[in-house]
Design a protein with these regions (language model features):
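Short beta-rich binding modules
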Residues: 1-133
Length: 133
């Protein structure tokens, strides 16, 4: 399977350009650094064709807080990657690498209380949106 060029955003560190195999198994392993078990990788849309790949259950696995993305504290290591119009993973362009390296350059620190409160806020907001349907 092909490899794609992505940005790795680890807790407490600056972003690093790296390669990932473009498979579900590789994605699951990549987002499970520090977890007891292999997690389930999921994506969160940042922009039109830019996504983050992260461990949805990172909070439950007590992974450390990393960065805040669209109002949600992401726990554990996550990756920034591109997607084609057909939603297939693709490499970031040099411009995208520069842009997202700058965006996530400064490490952020969160307490367990911050992470739990944020998780509850995100859950509440999701429930409010569901009620509107």
């Amino acid at each position: 399977m092909a490899e794609i060029t992505v940005l790795k955003i680890a807790p407490g560190k600056h972003p690093a350009k790296t390669k990932l195999k473009s498979t579900i198994e590789a994605f699951n392993r990549a987002v499970s650094v520090g977890a007891v078990e292999i997690g389930k990788a999921c994506t969160k849309k940042m922009e039109k064709d830019i996504y983050i790949l992260y461990n949805y259950y990172g909070c439950l696995d007590e992974l450390p807080g990393n960065r805040q993305v669209n109002g949600e504290i992401i726990t554990g290591t996550f990756f920034v990657l591109g997607a084609t119009q057909g939603y297939r993973p693709r490499s970031l362009t040099p411009h995208e690498i520069e842009r997202y390296s700058s965006l996530f350059w400064d490490p952020e620190v969160y307490s367990d209380t911050d992470i739990i409160k944020n998780s509850m806020d995100v859950l509440y907001d999701s429930l409010v949106e569901l009620e509107k349907l």
